[in-house]
């Protein structure tokens, strides 16, 4: 029997002798046959490498044991050691030992973005459809995701199933009797169309179809002459939704054959297509003929071949049978032929998981677990659970809904022979309604954490199995049983179609209750049930058991065998038994399965897509996608489980519609379902398919879909109205679909499950882990079930990390259409606009108002790109004080000066939210003002107890340093006990409380303070010193107190404009000395230079010790002073955040300011303010103050020399000199696509040598550098846009970006990073600046410089803080650490050693430095090593590494991105005038007044409008470049006063008409800057 079953399970193929590292089957069988030998002797020879001599150089895959018994407690552990290249898309598959095809895996796991070349995971094997024999031999194989190459294979592993009785003969008896029709059938496919095909990052495919007829997979099916028929469609250009008009394809086939359809992308030399495969269907001809019904359109979701494939979309077509084989076949054969296909799920909708190679076909598959023959004979499943179902069954609908569900293709192929045997075993019952038969089958399970979305695979893969396991235990389910089910049972109310089946269903049967009682009270043991599994026949529903309009509420009998009952029932399909519908209200099943419904957050089981027939006439009938199952740790997700949902036939009372599990099903009647990211989100989008008349039922077929969210807008975009309608429907529903996503409500749901009356909405709320269907952006911890939508369109739900989701409050208000909320890898919520392809940190509250002006696509794009980085504040100065500070009483000019840019981003677009205003007020509170005051350290010195606390408490020092650097940190630290105690030491209890403050006492008598201004409470006493208003000039004081900051350092906040390259010395007015307003004019020395000069005095230590006697004993501080004396300004920059040094220097403020170096007069250049050290008068308004630079300027003369030398060498080596041209013809609306195609098409030599020439299509302007500059501006804003998934925002701010670990899941990502590197290189050699902001480690990576601990702060601030604390403190007996880190690999949290044997090496005070270095390396490189290598490779394809190596990271940042700060004085001083204008002309004065009134973003846009880029060179406006070298900003008197100003970007010239009034000039200039963006010829 076992061998017979084995024969039906799969036909044995000989293994490919070229398969690497694998023992041959003969050897493996001989090893297994040596039963007489001791077991360990066989194990000694087990090795995955046939070359035992040099195995160290080969990849290996091994297992912890080679005999595994199902159900045993011991885990099977798989170890890998891969010597070749690895990739995040690598996967390990479980195969039968004789399987050669990579696609025929039984289970698989994807690696994910972390993981290394060595590791291990636990693999739990459960009794299932593949292990129906006493012994089965399997192996595991490791495949490289990108190339598909087999890396390693385990030796043979024998899996024993003690539950299967050796003598089971159920299959044999029936199998021999099956007859197959040998008559050919002719059919025609027409009206073929595909919807939502996968596209490249920016390219639409050119799809075509390959169709062929192949023999059925079973070995008994013959290969005939007609096999191999192949048809090819025409190629449809540039579309993801091809329609093959007027094309028909005819085929001849046996009923046992399969039709294979593959969609491919036409090969195009002009663009790099790495994978041309777009999706595949393998449809049994029988199923196809069953589903064809007149003119109705069949719809099948496309499947994939391997877990690493990216597939989306579905295929639709009509089938017309031109000649049928049925009349010549015997009745028995016809019954078998037709009956076989009512098995749950249509093979034609292959799982997204498995698009099969051409040689593998499938037959039918059972879905949930077989039901024994005797129970079928009664018309009830043997292990029924409590059900309630009423009404007549629409058999035709059974066919359609049955075929909607797609079992997994591929891994089920090797199962198909077994299933075929099942199908043909049971004799077809005469008179049976074959179209309503429901055969039960087990469904294979897979876990795949591989996202298939091609554009936004950007989120987290955190394993949540442990929590799922806990939920199951909490609910009292044995976790092992939870796995068995495989399928989610969905109820479906079928509409009655009298014409289709009247003769096949008997209207009544009075015995359903007795039948079911009998079946339910059977308590067969687990072994009996497993033994009976193979005996399942098709389960025809006899006409004698057609359901009556009665209700049967049957309680399963509790018994000691409850566990086994659960096992089997979870495998059962809800059979349309007499009066009972298990799917509608399966209480025992429902409660048992509830916990297993919710897809673990990031597992990402790749579901088989639910194929859908669409009849456009019915807008109400929809499908929604179901939750998948949650499993205990290490378990495979039921891929098949998710894929083929059983529909129980729940018929309907008149036109009452079955309640959809979530409201969105009613909401999106037209949208083809493309949800995405179920891997990360566990969320499901609706899959609506209209079909049937308007009264038709809705069905809830729930399975996470993995298609990209390319949504067709719904007619019902008014979410609230649709929701109200859906809610009102809820009360009238006759059939309740129990949401199994329920974790909390699962147990409670059981008693009420049988109700056929209306059920309250809370049933959905309890069951729906996402909450209601409104745009739920929060997910409840522990569950992410259910479909989710935001009321407008199915969007991806928050890909949240389960541990963190509780931090985000639930948001019930729907997002506007085409918006989606997400959480980035730092736990911050951001919003994605899918229409404009932008991201924003602010929640969009309503659909945008229609534009008043009709803007061109390019200007809309420019504005969106500007918003994408949240109004990048490179000029970090706020608007004029009167605009910003008037809102707060008594705040003086300083009110908003410490606001971070985030508070004012998009100030002209959206109003501030209440929380934002509250934050604004908080940041202006007395504690913040005190901490950031320039006098803070002076006051600190005068308070000995506070000073002692400050110096002794490193945490306190760290917090104060952070707050002084960026006031936003105060919100985080404000309730810290140390900080509160410290600040209260300065409070003056005698003073009145500030206005709006009130003191209260808690129940313990402790005083606390209420700030009614910001509606906050605090223990910090607001009566702190330094609250008096100060002159405006004081606001630019703090450069010497805080660290030098840069964009790459991720530190540019509003407050950071004080911290840039030296701004202004602290005004002397803050000291009680004579004011020196003209001091800067007399000695224009940058403040840092003054400090260095002061410290370089010969007797400096004596001078310092006079005021700071402790200096003599503080060797560390003395070393720092010596370091600054030696290194100069760069050394001071490095130490600028050192609190001890800052305090020391603050004592000598006056001396430093008054100190004039003796050689200053001899070297005038020493006294000149460098470009990075602007000097402006304290009388200037804050709006005109020089803002922070992107990076602190290095020592100017040295850097300028490097830069000149660099460009000179580029010129001598012929970089970018021609004579050839690098012609780029760019369409604005296809900017990246055109740029990628053309730049990647050039050779390395062409890129280096040729002169760049950019033309925008439709704009006849010549490129005298203006279009080139704009090209780099636009391409950098698009390419580094986090929307596309290549880059992500850094941890510290909302606009600097870094390489995203999730970019590994973007199609062709290595080529895109190469392209990014080439763009960086081209910008460098052609001397253009990029409008992009990167973190410091990015520039270090470009220079191949190792990162250190300080660089980590820009990636992960808290992680850096922890390591910094560890570095600064003695960790002896405090921390219990080893040289290991935890990573998620193949869906499991695994421990990775930072060094060999690291798990056994404790971290001590002696080796902590090495530990910190290794942790920094691991954290910075985590998930981005290969991407970084690709980018660096592209960069050095354009630029010689030796040329760039002269720069450090900070200098390279300046060369690539410029300082992009606007100094109005510098701008005005370096502007030329023509046509009669001069500096004192009234129009010019108005012009500069208008520029001064502009906010920072508008100034940048003006600069971009005139010069083509909003960045300016390091040297300032004097070094602006035009078409043929340096060309200053120019304003020319030209044009009519009715016209707008005009720009000539090639010459940096603005044509400004002589407007008669300031208001007209301001309005026209603003309009020109914000509304225009094209090039033209005069």
Swiss-Prot record:
One of its GO terms (biological process) is regulation of mitotic metaphase/anaphase transition. Residues 737-1074 are annotated as: Interaction with TP73. Residues 518-532 have a biased composition (Basic and acidic residues). One of its GO terms (cellular component) is cytoplasm. The modification Phosphoserine is found at residues 48, 858, 915, 1181. Residues 853-880 form a coiled coil. Pfam families: C2, HECT, HECW1_helix, HECW_N, WW. Its main location: cytoplasm. It comes from the Eukaryota. Its EC number is 2.3.2.26. Residues 1037-1046 have a biased composition (Basic residues). Residues 341-453, 496-802, 1030-1075, 1167-1193 are annotated as: Disordered. E3 ubiquitin-protein ligase that mediates ubiquitination of TP73. Acts to stabilize TP73 and enhance activation of transcription by TP73. Involved in the regulation of mitotic metaphase/anaphase transition. This is E3 ubiquitin-protein ligase HECW2. The gene is Hecw2.
């Amino acid at each position: 029997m076992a061998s017979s079953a084995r024969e039906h399970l799969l036909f044995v193929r000989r293994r490919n002798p070229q398969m690497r590292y694998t023992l041959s089957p003969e050897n493996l069988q001989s090893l297994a046959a040596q039963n007489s030998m001791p077991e360990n002797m066989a194990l000694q020879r087990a090795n995955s490498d046939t070359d035992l001599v040099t195995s160290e150089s080969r990849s290996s895959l091994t297992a912890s044991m080679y005999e595994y018994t199902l159900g045993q407690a011991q885990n099977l552990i798989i170890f890998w050691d891969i010597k070749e290249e690895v990739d995040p898309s690598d996967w390990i598959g479980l195969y039968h030992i004789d399987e050669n095809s990579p696609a025929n895996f039984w289970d698989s796991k994807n690696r994910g973005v972390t993981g290394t070349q060595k590791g291990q995971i636990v693999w739990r094997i459960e009794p299932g459809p593949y292990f129906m024999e006493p012994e089965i031999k399997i192996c595991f194989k490791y495949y490289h995701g990108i190339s598909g190459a087999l890396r390693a294979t385990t030796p043979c592993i024998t899996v024993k199933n003690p539950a299967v009785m050796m003598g089971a003969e159920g299959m044999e008896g029936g199998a021999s009797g099956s007859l197959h029709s040998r008559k050919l059938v002719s059919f025609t496919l027409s009206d073929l169309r595909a919807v939502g095909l996968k596209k490249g990052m920016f390219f639409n495919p050119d799809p075509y179809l390959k169709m062929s007829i192949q023999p059925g997979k079973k070995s008994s099916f013959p290969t005939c002459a007609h096999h191999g028929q192949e048809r090819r469609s025409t190629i449809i250009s540039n579309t993801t939704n091809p329609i093959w008009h007027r094309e028909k394809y005819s085929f001849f086939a046996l009923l046992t054959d399969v039709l294979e359809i593959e969609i491919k992308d036409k090969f195009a030399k002009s663009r790099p297509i790495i994978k041309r495969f777009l999706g595949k269907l393998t449809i049994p001809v029988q199923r196809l003929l069953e589903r064809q019904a007149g003119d109705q359109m069949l719809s099948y979701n496309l499947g994939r071949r391997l877990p690493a494939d990216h597939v989306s979309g579905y295929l639709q077509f009509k089938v017309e049978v031109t000649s049928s084989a049925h009349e010549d076949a015997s009745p028995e054969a016809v019954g078998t032929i037709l009956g076989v296909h009512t098995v749950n799920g249509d093979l034609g909708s292959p799982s997204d998981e498995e698009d099969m190679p051409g040689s593998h076909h499938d037959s039918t598959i059972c879905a949930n677990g077989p039901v024994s023959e005797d129970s079928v004979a009664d018309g009830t499943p043997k292990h029924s659970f409590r059900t309630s179902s009423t009404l007549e069954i629409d058999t035709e609908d059974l066919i359609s809904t049955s075929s909607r569900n797609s079992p997994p293709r591929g891994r089920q192929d090797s199962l198909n022979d077994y299933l075929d045997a099942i199908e043909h075993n049971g004799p077809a019952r005469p008179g049976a309604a074959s179209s309503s038969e429901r055969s039960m089958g087990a469904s294979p399970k897979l876990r795949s954490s591989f996202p298939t979305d091609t554009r936004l695979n950007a989120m987290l893969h955190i394993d949540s199995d442990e929590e799922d396991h806990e939920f199951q235990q909490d609910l009292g389910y044995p976790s092992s049983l939870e796995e068995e089910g495989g399928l989610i049972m969905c109820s479906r109310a079928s509409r009655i179609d009298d014409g289709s089946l009247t003769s096949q269903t008997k209207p009544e049967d009075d015995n359903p209750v007795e039948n079911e009682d009998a079946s339910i009270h059977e308590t067969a043991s687990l072994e009996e049930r497993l033994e009976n599994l193979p005996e399942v026949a098709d389960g025809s529903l006899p006409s004698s058991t057609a359901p009556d309009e009665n209700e049967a509420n049957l309680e399963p009998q509790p018994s000691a065998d409850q566990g086994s009952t659960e096992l089997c029932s979870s495998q059962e399909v809800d059979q349309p038994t007499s009066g009972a519908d298990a799917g509608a209200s399966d209480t025992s099943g429902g409660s048992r399965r509830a916990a297993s419904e919710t897809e673990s957050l990031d597992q990402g089981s790749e579901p088989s897509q639910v194929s859908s027939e669409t009849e456009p006439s019915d807008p109400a009938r929809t499908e929604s996608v179901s939750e998948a199952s949650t499993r205990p740790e290490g378990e495979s997700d039921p891929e098949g489980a998710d894929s083929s949902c059983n529909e129980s036939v729940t018929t309907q009372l008149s036109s009452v519609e079955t309640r959809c599990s979530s409201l969105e099903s009613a909401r999106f009647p037209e949208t083809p379902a493309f949800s995405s990211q179920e891997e990360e989100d566990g969320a499901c989008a609706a899959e609506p398919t209209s079909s049937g008349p308007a009264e038709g039922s809705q069905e809830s077929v729930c399975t996470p879909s993995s298609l990209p969210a390319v949504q067709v807008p719904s007619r019902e975009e008014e979410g609230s109205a649709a929701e109200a309608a859906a809610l009102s429907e809820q009360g009238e529903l006759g059939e309740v679909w129990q949401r199994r996503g329920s974790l909390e409500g699962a147990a409670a749901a059981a008693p009420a499950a049988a109700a056929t009356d209306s059920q309250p909405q809370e049933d959905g709320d309890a069951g729906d882990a996402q909450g209601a269907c409104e745009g739920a952006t929060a997910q409840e911890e522990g569950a992410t079930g259910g479909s989710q939508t935001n009321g407008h369109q199915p969007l991806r739900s928050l890909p949240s990390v389960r541990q963190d989701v509780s931090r985000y409050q639930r948001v019930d208000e729907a997002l506007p259409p085409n918006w989606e909320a997400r959480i980035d890898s730092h736990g911050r919520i951001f919003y994605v606009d899918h229409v404009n392809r932008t991201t924003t940190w602010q929640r969009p509250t309503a659909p945008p108002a229609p534009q008043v002006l009709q803007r061109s696509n390019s200007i809309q794009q420019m504005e969106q790109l500007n918003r994408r980085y949240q109004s990048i504040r490179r000029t970090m100065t706020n608007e004029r004080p009167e605009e910003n500070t008037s809102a707060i009483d008594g705040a003086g000019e300083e009110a908003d000066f410490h606001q971070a840019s985030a508070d004012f981003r998009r100030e002209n677009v959206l109003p501030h939210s209440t929380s934002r205003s509250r934050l604004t007020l908080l940041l202006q509170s007395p504690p913040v003002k005190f901490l950031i005051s320039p006098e803070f350290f002076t006051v600190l010195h005068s308070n000995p107890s506070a000073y002692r606390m400050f110096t002794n408490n490193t945490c306190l020092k760290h917090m104060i340093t952070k707050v002084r650097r960026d006031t936003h940190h105060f919100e985080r630290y404000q309730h810290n006990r140390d900080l509160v105690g410290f600040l209260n030491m300065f409070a003056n209890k005698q003073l009145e409380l500030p206005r709006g403050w009130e003191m209260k006492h808690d129940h313990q008598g402790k005083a606390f303070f209420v700030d009614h201004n910001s509606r906050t409470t605090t223990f910090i006493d607001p009566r702190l010193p330094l609250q008096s208003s100060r002159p405006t000039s004081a606001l630019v004081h703090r450069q010497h107190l805080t660290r030098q900051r840069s964009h790459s350092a991720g530190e540019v906040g509003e407050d950071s404009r004080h911290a840039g390259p030296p701004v202004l010395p602290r005004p002397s007015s803050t000291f009680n000395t004579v004011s020196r307003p003209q001091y800067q004019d007399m000695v224009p020395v940058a403040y840092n230079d003054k400090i260095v000069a002061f410290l370089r005095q010969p007797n400096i230590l004596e001078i310092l010790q006079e005021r700071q006697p402790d200096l003599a004993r503080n060797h560390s501080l003395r070393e720092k002073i010596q370091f600054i004396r030696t290194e100069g300004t760069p050394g001071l920059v490095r130490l600028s955040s050192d609190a001890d040094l800052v305090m020391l220097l603050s004592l000598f403020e006056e001396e430093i300011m008054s100190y004039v170096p003796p050689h200053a007069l001899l070297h005038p250049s020493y006294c000149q303010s460098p470009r990075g050290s602007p000097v402006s008068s304290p009388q200037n308004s804050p709006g005109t103050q020089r803002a922070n630079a992107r990076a602190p300027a290095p020592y100017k003369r040295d850097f300028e020399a490097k830069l000149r030398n660099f460009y000179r060498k580029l010129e001598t080596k012929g970089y970018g000199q021609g004579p050839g041209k690098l012609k780029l013809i760019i369409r604005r609306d296809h900017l990246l696509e055109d740029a990628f195609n053309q730049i990647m098409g050039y050779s390395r030599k062409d890129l280096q040598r040729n002169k760049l020439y950019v033309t925008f299509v439709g704009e006849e302007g010549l490129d005298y550098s203006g279009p080139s500059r704009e090209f780099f501006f636009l391409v950098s804003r698009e390419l580094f846009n986090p929307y596309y998934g290549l880059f992500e925002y850094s941890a510290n701010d909302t606009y600097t970006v870094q390489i995203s670990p999730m970019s590994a899941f973007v199609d062709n990502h290595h080529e895109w990073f190469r392209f990014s590197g080439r763009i960086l290189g081209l910008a460098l050699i052609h001397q253009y600046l990029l409008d992009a902001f990167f973190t410091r480690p990015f520039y270090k990576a470009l220079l191949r410089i190792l990162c250190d601990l300080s660089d980590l702060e820009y990636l992960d601030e808290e992680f850096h803080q922890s390591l910094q604390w560890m570095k600064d403190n003695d960790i002896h007996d405090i921390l219990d650490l080893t040289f290991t880190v935890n990573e998620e690999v193949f869906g499991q949290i695994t421990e990775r050693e930072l060094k060999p044997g690291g798990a056994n090496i404790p971290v001590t005070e002696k080796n902590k430095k090495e530990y910190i270095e290794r942790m920094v390396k691991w954290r910075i490189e985590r998930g981005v090593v290969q991407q970084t290598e690709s980018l660096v490779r592209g960069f050095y394809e354009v630029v010689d590494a030796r040329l760039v190596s002269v720069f450090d990271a900070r200098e390279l940042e300046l060369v690539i991105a410029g300082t992009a700060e606007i100094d109005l004085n510098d701008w005005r001083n370096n502007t030329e005038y023509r046509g009669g204008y001069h500096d004192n002309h009234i129009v010019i004065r108005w012009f500069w007044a208008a520029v001064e009134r502009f906010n920072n973003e508008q100034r940048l846009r003006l600069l971009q409008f005139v010069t083509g880029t909003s960045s300016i060179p390091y040297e300032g406006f004097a070094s602006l470049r035009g078409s043929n070298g340096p060309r200053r900003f120019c304003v020319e008197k030209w044009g009519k006063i009715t016209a707008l100003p005009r720009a000539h970007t090639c010459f940096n010239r603005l044509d400004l008409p002589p407007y008669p009034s300031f208001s007209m000039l301001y309005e026209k200039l603003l309009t020109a800057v914000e509304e225009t963006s094209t090039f033209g010829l005069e």
